[in-house]
Amino acid sequence: MTVSVGIDKIGFYTPSLYLDMAELATARGEDPNKYLIGIGQSKQAVIPPTQDIVTMAANAASQILTPALKAEVAMVLFGTESGIDNSKASAVYLAHLLGLSPKTRAIEVKQACYGATAGLQLAADYVRVHPQAKVLVIGADVARYGLRTAGEVTQGGGAVAMLVTADPQILTLDMVSSYHTEDVMDFWRPTYRTEALVDGKYSTNVYLDFFKTVWADYQQQTNRTIVDFDAFVFHLPFTKMGRKGLRQILPEAQPDQQKSLKAAFEASQEDNRNVGNLYTGSLYLSLLSLLRHGQLTAGARLGFFSYGSGAEGEFFSGILQPNYQRGFDGAALTTLLAQRKRVSVAEYEDIYRAQLSNDSRDVQLPVGEEVAQYYLAGRQNQQRQYREQ
Ligand code: CAA
């Protein structure tokens, strides 16, 4: 008998600062509605130098790992575009910070915004073969395009942590999925750069084309059609992108279903609208947002479109489980988002420039205002100094 495998728990972390998108629009000489409606973003996470992908991942993972679970994690698969080292995996730093058992396998997975999906599917296959195993999958990034660039409004950052197990509480993954790879230069980041290079309009077109391709292939493989779905969850670099994706397939549904799919989309974009782009974590923040704000019942089939520039697309699906509400702490997430401090555009620009420099100097970061459990205190002897409070 095949074991049912999928997402048992989800944790999420984003730093304690945000920038208001209407304020940014005004500062950049744009109509605020371009950002609020045209792009579909209201707030953007601002990442202080004291947070990086490792600390954000630790802050997300610590929400879902009890001491007993920490001892049981067989593997850590860390999806990220914002790696902090060209050799050593962020998963190794993370495993140490969290106090995981040394009997764990810890690696980093890279393919732009697709890394966490690769991690999730590899984890699911591993658990199908080893049903007792628990795998920690991370999607953590700092989405960084540059001050006064077209991509600036689509920045953000944070981490999603998922525990993949047999008989999961939140979602069982269907075994079938459809994926597609093409060598496309829509978004990339050479190792000498801290900001992505992007052909913005082209990237949005490739996203939509890839969605069309994998959705058609998935339907062919499964004989399922849109009527078999209760909601679609999209990679959301900005919320308008997923809205365009959904619009592409809505005509395949009857009017009643169109209404419910649109309502589910509104729920799925709510939290992303207030955090911004997490690159590889965005799809899974959108899932969390749907679970928090949507009206789904157990047994619902959800469709997922994952996209990572460069480019890789995947469509996969899963079934919502009866106790899905127990798999995440919705109240903690509401508090995390509500307690963030708004920074002005000038403060955001200062913080943007204050990131840990790309050189070998020793640095002590201003950690006095840091409220997160895990943070970065600086760099000594070319080693990042991670701390827990
Ligand atoms: N009121 C309402 N809407 C307005 C408006 C106003 N006053 N002014 C403009 N708009 C609308 C425009 O009509 C447009 O809507 P449509 O796309 O529906 O036509 C929207 O606002 C955006 O306007 P522009 O196209 O003029 O915006 P832009 O040229 O400044 O750039 C962008 C938009 C290309 C997305 C840019 O922000 C960018 O390059 N972002 C980074 C790349 C990106 O996120 N790509 C997504 C796919 S790649 C991916 O998914 C991987 C990843 O995470 C990086």
What are the functions of these language-model segments?
Residues 31, 53-68, 90, 206-222, ...:
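Short, well-ordered amphipathic alpha-helical segments that serve as non-catalytic structural scaffolds
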Residues 288-337:
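Catalytic phosphate/nucleotide-handling subdomain of diverse soluble enzymes
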Residues 1-50, 149-205, 209, 316-389:
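Condensing-enzyme catalytic core mediating Claisen C-C bond formation in acyl metabolism
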Residues 201-222, 227-246, 250, 271-276:
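A conserved active-site cap/scaffold subdomain adjacent to cofactor or substrate pockets
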Residues 34-38, 42-54, 82-134, 251-282:
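Conserved catalytic cysteine-centered active-site region
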Residues 7, 53-113, 223-249:
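Conserved beta-ketoacyl condensing-enzyme motif
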Residues 128-161:
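Flexible, glycine-rich active-site loops centered on histidine and acidic residues
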Residues 11-13, 79-84, 111-116, 139-144, ...:
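Acidic, glycine-rich active-site loops and adjacent beta-strand->loop/helix elements
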